[in-house]
Design a protein with these regions (language model features):
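N-terminal periplasmic/intermembrane-space "pro-region" immediately following the signal or transit peptide
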Residues: 13, 20-98, 105, 121-127
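Short loop/turn motifs that connect adjacent beta-strands in outer-membrane beta-barrel proteins
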Residues: 28, 66, 71-89, 121-134, ...
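Residue-level signature of outer-membrane beta-barrel architecture
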Residues: 80-82, 120-126, 180-183, 194, ...
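Transmembrane beta-strands of outer-membrane beta-barrel proteins
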Residues: 87-91, 130-137, 188-191, 233, ...
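Transmembrane beta-strands of outer-membrane beta-barrel pores
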Residues: 95-99, 138-144, 194-199, 249-253, ...
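Surface-exposed coil loops of outer-membrane beta-barrel proteins
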Residues: 147-178, 185-271, 275
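Detector for outer-membrane/organellar transmembrane beta-barrel domains
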Residues: 277-370, 382
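Outer-membrane beta-barrel "beta-signal"
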Residues: 412-424
Length: 424
């Protein structure tokens, strides 16, 4: 059996197994759905679910009002008007500036990202256990007058991976649109449509360059070569109170800027992943999420990219109400991103500092290139995120990149960073 046959058989088999197990666990005569289960795994930091939660929170800042405070009542009234229709909508704008201390190319970059996102309950009642939702997310990305956007800065300074995970340049696109069907609350969730695989496999509490760390070693994990948003399906099933699986297949040549019907139905090159996760609550510490993921990606007939695959793990564990350390490790073939092994670890704080909801984090990473003639690369980052007003967050931070793999003449490169995010 070829790699594609193994991929399809393994993932589809696990999806069917999850569906069957959940179905057998539901006895219509005895099963009660009065208490919905907590989502497992927790929503990824950049998922539509989490973006809606963050937009609605509006925690107090050092200022009572901010640049968009006049819009808040109008946006609130709009969401109240559409709420009876089962519709929720959020809007965010994030701007980033980075300046490097060295490197062979350009040394500063600025970019912006505007996001419109939401979900629409089209099946079931509010608070129901078997509801169906249409999810959507649109995005525009652009530079801010520096000649390059932040996504290109890593290549300019010879880094093995990016100084950000996103913040490139693209027109307005519908990057995600999919159906999400719940069975028994959050015990079983089936998704189908244009999906972002980073939201369903090998996520992490701190995995967001719009909200937390910027360096790609922490805001993503580039030892894994996941494709962009593409057509496919995902099944997430919860077993008991502390175990889940997340598995699925989608277009290996997915791109957020393209619908993907040609590559999915004509080429049928697939990406598949299987994740086993645990969500224990440790007495005296708090809740954690422990993820173990295997993935494989077919070679692309249209984009010419080679096949790739690997194993990754991602752990984040609360220690008390504020500290959340994390650890990630992975190994892959390195055929696409050029990284064979990678480890990252760090800690963050969420809670009372200057304001009640400030965040800081510090982390370090190591990566080994697939080309062993290149240097192993190390990176570290520290940041502080201040809640300026209920809608506005300001982040300042610094990255250190040691032995950038593609610039052997540089031993250490620093990257200063600032970020402003507005979310309503």
């Amino acid at each position: 059996m070829g790699s594609r046959g193994w991929l399809v058989s393994a993932v589809v088999g696990s999806m069917l197994g999850a569906l069957t197990s959940i179905a057998l666990a539901q006895d219509p005569a005895t099963q009660s759905f009065s208490a919905p289960l907590e989502l497992a795994p927790p929503p990824a930091p950049d998922s539509v679910d989490q973006d809606l939660i963050d937009a609605a929170a509006r925690p107090a800042g050092i200022l009572k009002y901010g640049p968009v405070s006049l819009i808040d009542p109008l946006w609130d009234n709009f969401n109240k008007t559409i709420d009876p229709l089962g519709l929720k909508v959020g809007l965010a704008y994030t701007a980033v500036y980075q300046a490097a201390s060295g490197g062979p190319g350009r040394r500063d970059a600025a970019g912006g990202d505007i996001d419109l996102f939401g979900d629409w309950r089209l099946l079931g009642e509010k608070g129901g256990q078997n509801n169906g939702y249409l999810y959507f997310a649109a995005e525009n990305r652009h530079d801010l007058g520096t000649g390059i956007a932040p996504s290109a800065l890593g290549g300019q300074i010879g880094s093995l991976w990016g100084t950000t995970n996103g913040f490139g340049e693209q027109p307005l696109v519908l990057k995600e649109v999919y159906w999400q069907q719940h069975f028994g609350g959050d015990r079983l969730i089936v998704r189908a449509g244009k999906l972002d695989p980073e939201n369903y496999y090998d996520s992490n509490h701190w995995q967001s360059d719009s909200k937390y760390f910027l360096n790609k070693a922490f805001s993503s994990f580039p030892v894994r070569a996941f494709p962009g948003q593409g057509l496919g399906a995902n099944v997430t099933a919860k077993f008991g109170e502390q175990m889940y699986i997340s598995t699925g297949v989608q277009d290996a040549q997915g791109k957020k800027t393209e619908a993907g019907f040609d590559t999915f139905f004509h080429d049928f090159n697939l990406f598949g992943a299987f994740e086993l996760g645990f969500t224990p609550t440790i007495e005296g510490w708090g809740k954690g999420t422990y993820r173990f993921t295997a993935w494989y990606r077919d070679a692309g007939e249209s984009d010419g990219k080679p096949h790739d695959g690997g194993l990754v793990m991602s752990i984040d564990q609360r220690i008390g109400p504020n500290f959340i350390p994390f650890f990630r490790a992975g190994a892959g073939e390195g055929n696409i991103n050029g990284i064979e092994y990678m480890v990252s670890s760090g800690v963050g704080w969420q809670g009372q500092l200057i304001t009640e909801s400030d965040v800081w984090g510090v982390a370090a990473a190591w990566g080994r290139p697939e080309d062993h003639d290149l240097n192993d690369q190390y990176a570290a980052e520290a940041f502080y995120r201040l809640q300026v007003s209920p809608d506005n967050q300001f982040t300042i931070g610094y990255q250190v990149i040691v032995n950038p793999s593609f610039d052997p003449d540089s031993h250490v490169v620093g990257v200063f960073e600032m970020r402003w995010r507005i979310s309503i």
